[in-house]
Amino acid sequence: MKRFNLLLLVLLAAVSCAPKAQYENRAEKILAEINDPNSKYVVVISHRGDWRNYPENSIPAIESIIRMGADMMELDVKMTKDSVLVLMHDRTVDRMTNGKGPVSSYTYDSLKTLRMRRPHNITTDSIRVPSLREALLCCKDRILVNVDHAYPYYKQIVELTEELGVTGQVLMKGKSSVDKVAEDMSKHEKNLLYMPIIDINTPKGQKLFAEYQEKNVVPLAYEVCWQYPAPEVDDCIATVIKTGSKVWVNTLWSTLCGGHGNDDDAAVNAADPAEVYGQYIDMGASMIQTDRPALLLDYLRSIGRHD
């Protein structure tokens, strides 16, 4: 089966040959867990970092989830007027800083004069919008990175990750066709890890998933999203596991993971978070993106599915 830049062969060898492999850094260990179809380890992806305590997509938010023990930082990227990639989810800086206007209207130096906001709209004294370079250096060898809202900047991101030596630690995901992804990746000597997003309740999502099966392409993982329970959900997840990929589930909000009562908020309100997270473990999910990393990590550790 074909794989386009899904993991270094040395990681495959390390997983298959050594019962207790030694890794040079934590990021390498997490990659090996993801690539091992027999691993019971559940990878925790923190959505925009620890945004409940720090500004989202900020360096302190990243440092906090690394201390927690999360495995991957999901971050969002925009480009400044002078072509510097920075961390920002929104098109404008209004919500997250004391400034106004589109990110693209600021030079990087002018953007750095703005102060970031904590939750509840509190402006910090000294936390600034980080560049993608700063964020990747913070994460390097310590945690994996999922770069979101970033496919238009693929070329620039690959050039940056190659310069910093982190290309194999950075994941991008999308809904492009198999052929489109392969064509785009063929333009580069080295590529980021890539994962398709499958909205399995929709005809487009079903078509994309069928395309991967028909072309015999096995990605590192699939992000499977569903708004409501249905036979196609169970069939998709079973096929993903059977073919050797990992299942990524989003518990950020209910429309991504099966409807009302199935998300992070439900886990907080439940008598036991197992009532929510346990159902995804039972389904075979081995990667979970969450807005409640501390809660999810505590649960996974309690059942022996995380360090």
Residue ranges of model-derived segments:
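Bacterial Sec-dependent N-terminal signal peptides
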Residues: 1-26
